């Protein structure tokens, strides 16, 4: 479970998005058990979550070794009441190909945190965000995520939220 402080920071991120008219479709890459998706569903008309629920992608990430059948079950239980949440059970890059460029209001990256994977996610998902939309994510305090952001957005001002979430207006 995410601590209440993290959930409050996510609410702040999505409120900020709504204030600048970003409230249509949101995509969450790396939904895990759906806690963030449920928060998103209250701020966006449509939420699409992406997660293949596969093990072993990163030996340094505890989520990579979780019981993914249980995680998926918890996700389904948690999101079932929300008619505006749907799921694509594919790896991030493959799932990104199902969206037209400029078609998404907000993308939240919280999947594979290795630098090369984050760079690939940024490269795949940034074109999908509409002009004026937001590319955001979690764990800017993790060195690999921070390095990926520096590689792709050096010199760009990002909004940082208290739980280490970040957001950039595209």
Question: What label would you give each PLM region?
Answer:
Residues 3-4, 11-170:
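S-adenosylmethionine/decaboxylated-SAM
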């Amino acid at each position: 479970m995410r601590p209440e402080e993290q959930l409050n920071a996510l609410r702040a991120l999505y409120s900020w998005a709504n204030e600048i008219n970003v409230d249509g479709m949101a995509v969450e890459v790396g939904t895990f058990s759906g806690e963030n998706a449920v928060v998103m569903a209250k701020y966006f008309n449509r939420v699409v979550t992406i997660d293949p629920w596969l093990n072993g992608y990163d030996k340094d990430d505890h989520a990579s070794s979780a019981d993914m059948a249980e995680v998926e079950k918890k996700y389904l239980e948690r999101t079932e009441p929300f008619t505006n949440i749907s799921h694509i059970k594919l790896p991030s890059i493959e799932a990104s190909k199902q969206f037209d460029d400029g078609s998404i209001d907000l993308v939240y990256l919280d999947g594979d945190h290795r630098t090369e994977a984050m760079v690939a996610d940024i490269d795949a998902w940034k074109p999908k965000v509409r002009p004026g939309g937001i590319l955001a994510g979690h764990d800017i305090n993790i060195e690999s995520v921070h390095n990926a952001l520096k590689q792709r957005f050096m010199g760009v001002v990002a909004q940082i939220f208290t739980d280490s979430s970040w957001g950039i207006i595209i």
